[in-house]
């Protein structure tokens, strides 16, 4: 990283007046309908600031984007992270990225089985969408047979967990300062990954491989029942498959993995479709129908998701996403509503609501939403783009 900082400093001094300065400020307020299981407050607010510097030349791109977050209740949710800090060299059939970045793998809407490059910021939300920046070197080769991305990943990032004052957290305290690693190199181990992708008419396909420290730790006792749990990071290898097949207005999606290193080798998959009705009722509004199922060899339950997506296609980019998740084994139901709309040219307002319902049927099966049973909430988020 010191070498990268020197290169970037020289690059900045040589091109300081050609840079584009961007950024965003986000004000978030979450109102929980009930007092938390550990008597946490009902109202949680946060402020985040993400300045951004971007510069593009003929064969180079520089990108810098830190993120700062301050939470009103939970100190463990405070964040100072480099999301992007890299140089990208663009050649005729080759690209080389050196620095810190975020890489997304996946095609499904709800659970991204194959997305393993970056660590999840679990304090941002339980959906696993928000990630931390990952130091890396990435080489991309573009050939007639497809695109091959090869990664060397340095300086492992531990998963972020909410503290005792936080909401949407697990029902026990986790001490990440005492984390244990299977690898003798601990968080200094270099991980490796590769991903091949291509498209054939209506089919997009990707096959990936990862070898390194798992991004999903097991939580183990620390020796006493009244003490926090400790994250245990095992060394794994994982093969992944992504499929996206388009038939007119129908998109069929599959993500599947096979992983070894966390007990017996297991497989898991998310699969489903999204069908879009274009211009419903002779309007500009598109209505998408979403169905996704899940499978995991380790679990008896296979949650199913049914949702809709309304795209108004107006100049303010209004969208509404809603969905139900049903666990047929534990008999639990969850409901999610998300909507967003631009306010003028500089701002965005987003609303989100989450509700968890349990039938109280005692069938001795693990409860998917048990940790969040008192965490039904409504969130309003205001974003100002600099």
Each PLM stretch: what is its role?
Residues 25-31, 64-68, 98-100, 150-154, ...:
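Transmembrane beta-barrel strands of outer-membrane/channel proteins
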Residues 54-167, 201, 358:
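Outer membrane beta-barrel
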Residues 49-55, 84-89, 137-141, 194-198, ...:
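Residues on the lipid-exposed face of transmembrane beta-strands in outer-membrane beta-barrel proteins
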Residues 58-63, 93-96, 145-148, 202-205, ...:
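Repeated loop/turn-to-beta-strand initiation elements of outer-membrane beta-barrel proteins
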Residues 39-47, 78-83, 131-135, 142, ...:
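Residues that define the transmembrane beta-barrel architecture of outer-membrane proteins
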Residues 33-42, 73-81, 109-115, 161-167, ...:
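Outer-membrane beta-barrel translocator domains and adjoining extracellular loop/strand segments
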Residues 273, 355, 372-386:
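Outer-membrane beta-barrel "beta-signal"
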Residues 247-327:
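Detector for outer-membrane/organellar transmembrane beta-barrel domains
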């Amino acid at each position: 990283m010191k070498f990268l900082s020197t290169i970037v400093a020289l690059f900045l001094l040589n091109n300081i007046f050609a840079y584009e300065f961007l950024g965003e400020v986000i004000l978030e307020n979450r109102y929980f309908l009930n007092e938390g299981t550990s008597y946490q407050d009902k109202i949680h607010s946060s402020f985040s600031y993400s300045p951004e510097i971007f510069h593009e030349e003929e064969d180079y791109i520089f990108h810098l984007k830190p993120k700062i977050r301050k939470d009103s209740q939970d100190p463990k949710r405070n964040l100072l992270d480099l999301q992007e800090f890299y140089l990208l060299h663009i050649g005729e059939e080759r690209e080389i990225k050196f620095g810190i970045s975020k890489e997304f793998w996946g095609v499904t809407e709800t659970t991204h089985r194959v997305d393993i490059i970056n660590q999840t910021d679990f304090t941002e939300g339980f959906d696993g969408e928000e990630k931390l920046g990952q130091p890396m070197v990435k080489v991309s080769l573009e050939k007639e047979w497809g695109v091959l991305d090869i990664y060397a990943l340095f300086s492992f990032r531990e998963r972020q967990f909410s503290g005792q004052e936080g909401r949407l957290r697990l029902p026990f305290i986790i001490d990440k300062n005492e984390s244990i690693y299977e690898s003798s190199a601990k968080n200094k181990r270099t991980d490796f990954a590769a991903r091949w992708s291509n498209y054939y008419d209506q089919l997009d396909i990707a096959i990936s491989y990862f070898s390194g420290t798992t991004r999903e730790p097991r939580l183990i006792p620390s020796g006493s029942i009244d003490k926090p749990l400790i994250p245990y990071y095992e060394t794994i290898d994982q093969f992944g498959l992504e499929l996206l097949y388009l038939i007119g207005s129908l998109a069929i999606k599959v993500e599947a993995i096979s992983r070894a290193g966390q007990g017996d080798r297991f497989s898991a998959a998310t699969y489903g479709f999204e069908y879009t009705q274009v211009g419903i009722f002779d309007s500009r509004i598109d209505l998408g129908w979403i169905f996704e199922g899940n499978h995991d060899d380790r679990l008896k339950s296979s949650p199913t998701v049914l949702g809709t997506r309304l795209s108004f296609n107006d100049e303010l980019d209004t969208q509404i996403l809603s969905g139900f998740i049903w666990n047929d084994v534990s008999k639990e139901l969850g409901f999610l509503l998300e909507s967003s709309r631009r306010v003028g040219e500089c701002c965005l307002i987003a609303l989100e609501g989450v509700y968890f319902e349990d039938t109280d049927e005692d069938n001795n099966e693990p409860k998917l939403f048990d940790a969040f049973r008192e965490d039904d909430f409504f969130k309003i988020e205001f974003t100002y783009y600099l």
